[in-house]
């Protein structure tokens, strides 16, 4: 079994996350994808609580799973009483899937700081690292050969930050989110001024 792990704040999850999940299933041959909802203290938060972000991520998984069960939302990182590090998440996932091949899916922006992450060597031992680059012109520090690191071009102009900003300005984002998440955001009154 091949298990992919994608961590993020998912504040909110959007069609870019949906596309990445489907890409992982179809082109990386991932059998199971875990979307781990985390809390990044470096990221500005608007108004979505941990439980709301987890609920929206579960809605995203429901959308992804319409074509077959593949994706699970995970709140393990939110439940930790200490700062959560990727290496700890991967240890947890390894305990759930002891014989699986693990792939950590990371965005290009996160990859740039990979060397400063807690235990990057152990991360590479626990999982293949797949970096989703926004395109060759954006990936300025891509090493030609890094053991265990795979670079995949994945151009997606969406970001949760951009969506929160548009919602706060009263703009529609319905074409940029799964409809269930759009309805949830409107029902909960998230990201407004």
Curated annotation (Swiss-Prot):
SUPFAM superfamilies, alphabetized: Nucleotidylyl transferase (SSF52374)
GO biological processes: NAD biosynthetic process
Keyword DNA damage attached: no
Keywords, alphabetical: ATP-binding, NAD, Nucleotide-binding, Nucleotidyltransferase, Pyridine nucleotide biosynthesis, Transferase
Enzyme class: transferase
Top-rank taxon: Bacteria
S-S pairs: none
Pathway field: Cofactor biosynthesis; NAD(+) biosynthesis; deamido-NAD(+) from nicotinate D-ribonucleotide: step 1/1
Entry EC no(s): 2.7.7.18
UniProt xrefs under Pfam families: CTP_transf_like
Catalytic activity: nicotinate beta-D-ribonucleotide + ATP + H(+) = deamido-NAD(+) + diphosphate
GO function terms (MF aspect): ATP binding; nicotinate-nucleotide adenylyltransferase activity
Entry annotated with the keyword Nucleotide-binding: yes
Family: Belongs to the NadD family.
Annotated function: Catalyzes the reversible adenylation of nicotinate mononucleotide (NaMN) to nicotinic acid adenine dinucleotide (NaAD).
Record-given protein name: Probable nicotinate-nucleotide adenylyltransferase
Gene: nadD
